[in-house]
Amino acid sequence: MKSSIVAKLEALQERREEVEVLLGDPGVISDQIRFRALSKEYAQLSDVTRCFQHWWQVQEDIHTAEHLLQDPEMRDMAQEELLASGASLEQLEQQLQVLLLPRDPDDERGCFLEVRAGTGGDEAALFAGDLFRMYSRYAETRRWKVEIVSASYGEHGGFKEVIAKVSHEGAYGLLKFESGGHRVQRVPETESQGRIHTSACTVAVMPEIPEAELPEINAGDLRIDTFRSSGAGGQHVNTTDSAIRITHLPTGLVVECQDERSQHKNKAKALAVLGARLRAAEVQRRQQEESSTRRNLLGSGDRSDRIRTYNFPQGRVTDHRIGLTLYRLDEVIEGKLDMLIQPIMQEYQADQLAALSETP
């Protein structure tokens, strides 16, 4: 293992000892926010240091076995020990490199999930409804809470656009790979001649950011309109102008919220979504600058960034980023997304490891 990696691991071991002392400090214990943050850091550092200590032990075992090779009576046993320890050392080094990969601090957060119908008219809106149902089913299996923040319904079902808040620690870390263009190929129910139509939707996943970390938004940059809430088919579901539409004038971003009966609550939700969008745009801009020479498995959320195709006649789903094709569309559309998400996460991790190995 490279000396630079060993140095990083030794520094983390020292940091773990520091955090352990801090966790016993009465001043830290009385500050619950700091205590929770340090407890979380301690748990993460403990995973690394346990693995590192095991690595050192295996190194010592190898050194002892090499010494025993000089003894004719112990040579066979020493050779067996060297083979076993060598394999163990290689595995531990891989584990340590994975543990050293930079963590996205947003991964442990909840998220906002946005699904927009693209090209394809009514069929695109129906597909947006299918995608939202797919994500809702996935959330159900993990016992996540999904709450619609804003919805614009299609004339014949589905959604023109739907924004939902997914409340659970770690939701963003799993769903962030869903951002991008999703394409569907199927025969619409209204198609009498059995022709396959192609429609598209865009999915954007943004971390839910605590209010203290949201970008500062100048009130003068906002145009706030109120209107009457409406449901599917356009019928009004409220007799007061409680729905809110916020336009961020510098960027043109528009967020609507009509889920609550209270105008104040709708405004708070809309501002939270707007803040998340603005922050996501800034993070994406930075990532593009930093990784211009490396492929990015994290979709941008742009319509042109097609990440996946769902072909219903063939029962096939293809993720274009990693060239993965599964003939299990029925299961995927019912929310069994781990068979897609896990391979993408593994590929993403492999890319990060490749980048780590290139650093001096």
From Swiss-Prot:
Feature: compositional bias, Basic and acidic residues: 284-293
Modified positions (N5-methylglutamine) in chain numbering: 235
Superkingdom of source: Bacteria
GO MF term list: translation release factor activity, codon specific
Post-translational modification (record): Methylated by PrmC. Methylation increases the termination efficiency of RF1.
PANTHER family in the record: LD18447P (PTHR43804:SF7)
Designated name of the protein: Peptide chain release factor 1
